């Protein structure tokens, strides 16, 4: 890594992608930029996605508003990458299984949180008269 950094002293996201990233990392970074411009959140899963996100954010800071860390990978460097992105993971299960497993596990939690934030009414907006009696009638109390 040190030799590579000496040969390629680029510090910007595009330069780092060009010097060290594969096509898949560049595609992820580009996809993150496109998603952010379309207002679509991106669920990150693992160290490679964190690296692509760091490059994408460096190229377009707006991307950071659309990133969600699905989990903290157990891969070395993951905590530092999430810290650099300013993200707290939804889950921290010590996973490093690959194949999108962290995102697959985190997705139901993210989806539920979104539904709760955007779909639930405040208690004052509900027409609740006697909630205890209603729950007793339903056999829930």
Regions found by a protein language model. Give the residues of each.
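N-terminal loops that bind phosphate or other acidic moieties
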Residues: 1-141
């Amino acid at each position: 890594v040190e030799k590579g950094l000496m040969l390629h002293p680029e510090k910007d996201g595009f330069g780092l992608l060009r010097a060290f990233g594969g096509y898949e990392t560049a595609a992820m970074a580009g996809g993150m930029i496109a998603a952010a411009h379309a207002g679509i959140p991106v669920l990150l899963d693992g160290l490679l996605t964190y690296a692509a996100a760091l490059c994408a954010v460096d190229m377009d800071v707006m991307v950071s508003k659309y990133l969600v860390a699905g989990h903290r990978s157990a891969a070395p460097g993951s905590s530092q990458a999430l810290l650099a992105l300013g993200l707290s993971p939804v889950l921290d299960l010590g996973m490093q299984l690959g194949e999108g497993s962290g995102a697959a596990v985190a997705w139901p939690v993210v989806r539920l949180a979104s539904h709760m934030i955007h779909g639930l009414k405040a208690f004052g907006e509900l027409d609740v008269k006697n909630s205890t009696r209603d729950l007793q009638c339903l056999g829930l109390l």
